[in-house]
């Protein structure tokens, strides 16, 4: 991989890997090599959840568990991580197989989100928990400053359902219209039909649940709740 691209990424991350092979593994999708990033992603997911949970616990001493769980879910959900991946310009650094390259995997939200988690796992193995915690908090500084407890942190499907129920409208219906990819790396496309919207709203995700949440979020935007 181009060293200029790698160095630019490390500057954006705010961290330089001592073991460059960990960085390369974190950037490697399973379509490109047998030494891919899924184990690092597993590790990074757990570390991220802990660091964000601890940060919320310290910041909001009077907030109950339900609100903290919803805030954490907002901060660690796939589209937040994918947004962060785009801020790092991860797409230009990913190591993808020919099929994923052809299908635009370098901009797929699920791949960007998974890679951010893999980078967190890689940083932990390259350093220690204190270093990776400081790095995560640096990445999340503005998002942590902006977040607050309340109904806004409920997941999109719940918010959409409550909105419709409050207006005595039928509940939304979700229909799987397409499933792409292999069993280990699928992308679901969902159509969500909502009273008050003339056309179905489309959502995609790496699981049916994530695709439904994405569709519900788009429906909320169209209903001008966001």
From Swiss-Prot:
Residues 6-128 form the RNase III domain. It is found in: Cytoplasm. The active site is at 45, 117. InterPro entries: dsRBD_dom, RNase_III, RNase_III_dom, RNase_III_sf. Its cofactor is Mg(2+). Mg(2+) binds at residues 41, 114, 117. One of its GO terms (cellular component) is cytoplasm. Residues 155-225 form the DRBM domain. Keywords: Cytoplasm, Endonuclease, Hydrolase, Magnesium, Metal-binding, mRNA processing, Nuclease, RNA-binding, rRNA processing, rRNA-binding, tRNA processing. The keyword Zinc-finger does not apply. Pfam families: dsrm, Ribonucleas_3_3. It catalyses: Endonucleolytic cleavage to 5'-phosphomonoester. Its EC number is 3.1.26.3. GO terms for biological process: mRNA processing; regulation of gene expression; rRNA processing; tRNA processing. Coiled coil: none annotated. One of its GO terms (molecular function) is rRNA binding. Its main location: cytoplasm. Homodimer. Digests double-stranded RNA. Involved in the processing of primary rRNA transcript to yield the immediate precursors to the large and small rRNAs (23S and 16S). Processes some mRNAs, and tRNAs when they are encoded in the rRNA operon. Processes pre-crRNA and tracrRNA of type II CRISPR loci if present in the organism. This is Ribonuclease 3. It comes from Serratia proteamaculans (strain 568).
């Amino acid at each position: 991989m181009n060293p200029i691209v790698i160095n630019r990424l490390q500057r954006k991350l705010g961290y330089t890997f001592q073991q460059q092979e960990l960085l390369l593994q974190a950037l490697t999708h399973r379509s490109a090599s047998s030494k891919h990033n899924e184990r690092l992603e597993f590790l990074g997911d757990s570390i991220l959840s802990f660091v964000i949970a601890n940060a919320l616990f310290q910041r909001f001493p009077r907030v109950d568990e339900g609100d903290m769980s919803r805030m954490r879910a907002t901060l660690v959900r796939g589209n937040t991580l994918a947004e962060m991946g785009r801020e790092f310009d991860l797409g230009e650094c990913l190591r993808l197989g020919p099929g994923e390259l052809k299908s635009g995997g370098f901009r797929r939200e699920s791949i960007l989100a998974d890679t951010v988690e893999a980078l967190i796992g890689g940083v932990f193995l390259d350093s220690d928990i204190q270093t990776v915690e400081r790095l995560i908090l640096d990445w999340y500084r503005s998002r942590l400053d902006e977040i607050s407890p309340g109904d806004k942190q409920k997941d999109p499907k719940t918010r959409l359902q409550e909105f419709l129920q409050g207006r005595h409208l039928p509940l939304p219906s979700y229909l799987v219209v397409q499933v792409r990819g292999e069993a280990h790396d699928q992308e679901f496309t969902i159509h969500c039909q909502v009273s008050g919207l003339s056309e179905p709203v489309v959502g995609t995700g790496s699981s049916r649940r994530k695709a439904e949440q994405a569709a519900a979020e788009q429906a909320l935007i169209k209903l001008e709740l966001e």
